[in-house]
Structures are given as C-alpha cells and as structure tokens.
C-alpha cells in the first residue's frame, strides 16, 4: 500500500493531468486516509469507514484519467468498472457483486507478484542450479547418484560465471516443466460467473498438477521459465489468499464510471432494470455487506468507492437519496479552457506532442511544434468544442490526427527531414474544415 503524502500524490497526478486541483486533492486525501486508518489500533480501525467520493464534470476533463493514474499510485487492489454494464439481480446481465469478485482476483494477482518478488533472488539461484545440473550431470557412484553440490568445484564455478555473463545464452538444453493445464473455456451466462469459475477449477484439477513435460529451449529462455517455476514453489498459496483478502477488504478501491447513466429520468416509464435497480443493488455494497467469492467471504465495509459521471442530462439529485448519502464528498471538475488545452499538448509526461515526435522519429523524421502552432491547435479544439459537442481533451486526438495525416502517410519516403508544425501549417490543414460548421461537425 502506498504511503505517499497527499502533496506527493497530487504532485504525481500533476505530471499527467492538467488542472482539476479539487479532484486531485480529494483523491489524494482519500488515498492517504487509507494509510492513516491502517496505523490505528484494531478497535478504532473497525470504526473508521472511508468517505466515498462523487466526481462530477463534463466528458474529457480528466475523471477517468485520474482513476487510471490513481490505480498505479495506490499500490493497492484497484478496479474500474462502468455502471452501465450491470443490471439488477434476476435480469440478464452482470450483477454488481461481480465487482467485488473481480477486485479479489486483482488482489490475489497483486499479492502473488509481491510474494514472488521477495523470493526472486532465491529462485534465481535455484534456477541456476537446475541449469548447471543439466550442463554438468551429477557423478554416479555405485548404485546411487551423488549430486556434486560442492560450490568450490572449479568446473561448476566456471560454468556459473559463464552463465551469469550470458556466454551460454544460445546453448540449447532440455528441461522438465509442469505440463500445461487443460484449458476448459466455459462461456458464463450473465449472473452465473461464480458457478462457471467453480466448474473451470474442477476441470483443471482433474487434469493433474504433478505431470511434467520435457521441453527444449535456449538457456536464456529456460532461465526465465525456471525462475518463475521455482518462485511459484517457494510461495505459499494459502498465505497469498489470506493476505489478498485482507488487502481487498481494507485497502481495496472501486472506481465506478458513468454513474450518471444509471439515473432514472423523470419522463421514462416501465421497469428500469439497468438504472434504478442497479442503484439499489449498489447500496449494500457501498454501505458494507459480505460477498461470497471463490476465495472466501469478503466484507465491503472498508472499501473506498469513487463514482464519476458527466451529469449532462441527469443531475446528481436524480440518484436515489440513499445512494447520494453514501457518496458524501462531492467534487466538481471544470470544463477545459483554451489555455488548459494548450498545456495538455505539451506539459504532461508523454504528452500528445511528445508521442507524435517519438512515433515519427522511428521513420527518421524530426518533428517540432512551435508555440504558435500549439496555441492554434488548442484554439481550434476549443472552437470546435464550443460550436459542436464538447468532448474535452479528446478533441485534441481528432485534430492531431487530421493535422499529421499526410505526414504520417508519407513518412517512410521523407526520411531525414525536419518539420515544424507552426500556425501556418495548422491553418492550412484545418481552416477549411473549421469555417464549414457542417463539415467540422462530422469530421472534427
């Protein structure tokens, strides 16, 4: 779990997301509170519940990007889901409890990676020993095999040195590996994912875990495979499961996107199985309930829920009152200005302009963006957003593709050229489309 301070978390988010300081502060505090809670004594820890967040803002301003970056920073079980994929219990579609099951699977994977990293050095030594045993077969005396384990053996040490220096990488060896388990892929009927998981587990256990298969491969590849195999033997699956369930219950973060799409609209009639019904099913999950998973029972009392939505048609007050009460922290994200769009093109790490420079550099083209060129692209994006649908920063992707369309097509024939995208270059490619509103509506 991350022990970064709120300022450090916000600073890290600033490297990738322009503006939206209120939203960054809210998620930074929420993430730090996860760490603070774990420092409390057991009795107090049970009483402190997370304050869930509702992020409100137009499309393309950074709601989903904050979630993506938070997942990398959290170093905790994190899952992002779309609210529109779920239906209420009893109807065709995924039920909301599958969110918790997916979170537990993420926690198991994360914990296994952490545990395998702890035994990596030991696994490397064991893998080297297995390779050396193949290269220098054990000596045979009488009826028994005696393994030559003496580390001061000159031959063995010589081969170990060559192995570590990579001089034996291309030599082929034959190694014993666990036989691949029979993959029985069962298409899960909606709402029955848990049962199909159990069936898959049953078929895999019938295939037998102790079977081995000989494979020929180069030493470089064999070492990687053997390190994984040895690390898997060194870790305890029961410990992994126990730690993962604790981590999911106490550090788990669930990000629910597009929550505005499950609001009941006043003019709609008939059963709303994918709207209000889903909200009612989410209530016990957010409030705290126990969900049955194939790894055991999981409590959701201390999981952090972050919901987000554009709320262009619906309003936050259209959510059922009980759900509003369970999302106490409201954060409003602002629409992007012309200056924000210009910053998005240049300031974030791996910004759009840097991505296109790197892509065209592979063809031997040196691409540069002048300041007036960047300003012109930002102004054009803002203008199209204002006159048609406002899709925020996503508009920049459309414009950049349009501006660099010809250059990308002819790049392989223009090797060695140096090209600057300035105001005139942008005007030549975009102005005709911008002036014709009907064309810009469909093309930009």
Curated annotation (Swiss-Prot):
It holds the Pfam family ClpB_D2-small. ATP binds at residues 18, 60-65, 257, 322, 394. One of its GO terms (molecular function) is proteasome-activating activity. It comes from the Bacteria. It comes from Psychromonas ingrahamii (strain DSM 17664 / CCUG 51855 / 37). One of its GO terms (biological process) is proteolysis involved in protein catabolic process. Keywords: ATP-binding, Chaperone, Cytoplasm, Nucleotide-binding, Stress response. PANTHER family: ATP-DEPENDENT CLP PROTEASE ATP-BINDING SUBUNIT CLPX-LIKE, MITOCHONDRIAL-RELATED, ATP-DEPENDENT PROTEASE ATPASE SUBUNIT HSLU. ATPase subunit of a proteasome-like degradation complex; this subunit has chaperone activity. The binding of ATP and its subsequent hydrolysis by HslU are essential for unfolding of protein substrates subsequently hydrolyzed by HslV. HslU recognizes the N-terminal part of its protein substrates and unfolds these before they are guided to HslV for hydrolysis. This is ATP-dependent protease ATPase subunit HslU. A double ring-shaped homohexamer of HslV is capped on each side by a ring-shaped HslU homohexamer. The assembly of the HslU/HslV complex is dependent on binding of ATP. It is found in: Cytoplasm. Belongs to the ClpX chaperone family. HslU subfamily. InterPro entries: AAA+_ATPase (IPR003593), ATP-dep_Clp_protease_ClpX (IPR050052), ATPase_AAA_core (IPR003959), Clp_ATPase_C (IPR019489), HslU (IPR004491), P-loop_NTPase (IPR027417). One of its GO terms (cellular component) is HslUV protease complex.
